[in-house]
Design a protein with these regions (language model features):
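Dinucleotide-binding Rossmann-like beta1-alpha1 core, especially the glycine-rich loop
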Residues: 18-96, 216-221
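Glycine-rich FAD pyrophosphate-binding loop
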Residues: 1-14
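Helix-loop-beta segment of a Rossmann-like dinucleotide-binding subdomain
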Residues: 49-60, 74, 94-133, 154-155
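Glycine-rich nucleotide phosphate-binding loop and flanking beta-alpha elements
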Residues: 9, 67, 123, 175-176, ...
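Flavin-dependent oxidoreductases
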Residues: 21-23, 146-223
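Helical element adjacent to the flavin cofactor pocket in flavoenzyme catalytic cores
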Residues: 109-167, 171, 175
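Residue-level detector of anion-binding/catalytic polar loops
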Residues: 84, 136, 186
Length: 223
């Protein structure tokens, strides 16, 4: 049973960036991310519902020695999980992606298999797949109370009705802290502002431009 306080994608999902990357800061995260991309591709065929995937790849650039070492370590990890990754020097980056100012760039890694997806479309694809496997989804059903007995979860109260259960998966994003308090659990989570800029059309910008991540400047761009 999935309980949605409003409607699917009505929270922060609708304006999410939708980046689907494979490379993570650790082996475990890399494995999970690769599984996610594979799952989306599989479900597109299984439930006949698009995930809105655009396989344009992703380019991460480094402007400090520390960041360059980090990206190279991540590239090694990616190779262990058969993730296609290519290490590029600044000259190659400038040649292939002239939109990038490489004056301060040391190098970068290209992940051709990375993609971007439509968050709303992905959500409804997952919901469709879940329903086909017997899941029930109830919208406009905010959880009013989490019921515990002898220190264990025993149910939730929704619209004055009690649903008995043994386990709860809390997937409420930035609202998880408040929901956790209903069960006496302290979740150290606090939302932070995030900004994005939409530009005017850029002449001759390739439709296949990869997502470009500049971690040193805490920014990314995508077409």
């Amino acid at each position: 049973i999935l309980l949605e306080r409003d409607q699917l994608t009505s929270g922060t999902t609708w304006h999410a960036a939708g980046l689907v990357s494979q490379l993570g800061p650790s082996a475990a995260i890399t494995k999970i991310r690769k599984y996610t991309l594979d799952l989306y591709k599989e479900l597109e065929k299984k439930v006949d519902h698009s995930a809105g995937l655009r396989l344009n790849g992703a380019l991460s650039i480094a402007e400090t020695k520390g960041r360059w070492q980090e990206l190279q370590r991540q590239a090694t990890t990616a190779q262990l999980y058969d993730v296609d990754v290519r290490i590029l020097d600044k000259d190659q980056i400038k040649k292939d992606y002239p939109i990038v100012n490489t004056e301060d760039v040391i190098g970068g890694i290209l992940m051709p298999g990375d993609s971007a997806a439509d968050p709303k479309v992905v959500t409804h694809m997952l919901a469709k797949a879940a329903r086909q496997e017997g899941a029930q989804i109830f919208e406009k059903s905010p959880v009013e109370e989490i019921i515990t007995k002898d220190g264990k979860i025993s149910g939730v109260k929704v619209k004055g009705q009690t649903i008995e259960c043994e386990y709860i998966v809390l997937a409420s994003g930035m609202w998880s802290r408040q929901i956790g308090e209903k069960a006496g659990v302290s979740i150290p989570l606090y939302p932070a502002e995030h900004f994005y800029i939409i530009t005017e059309p850029i002449e001759n910008l390739s439709k296949t431009l990869p997502t470009i991540r500049d971690f040193d400047n805490r920014t990314y761009i995508k077409e």
